[in-house]
């Protein structure tokens, strides 16, 4: 279970990094907050 969860988290980080690089016009602070909230929401849904 730990291995599967870590793989999911890793893929999500890659997805987030891709979105961030694709949208450079977004402010750093705003993107960081949205990324953190998105990761928290996704983590709660998967668990």
From Swiss-Prot:
Q: Which domain of life is it from?
A: Bacteria
Q: List the InterPro entries.
A: DUF2527
Which Gene Ontology terms describe the biological processes this protein takes part in? cellular response to cell envelope stress; cellular response to heat; cellular stress response to acid chemical
> Which keywords fit this entry according to its UniProt record?
Stress response
Q: Which factors induce or repress this protein, as stated in its UniProt record?
A: Expressed during stationary phase, induced at 45 degrees Celsius (at protein level), at a post-transcriptional level.
Keyword Iron attributed: no
The text of the family note is: Belongs to the YobF/DUF2527 family.
Q: What is this protein called?
A: Protein YobF
Annotated source species: Escherichia coli (strain K12)
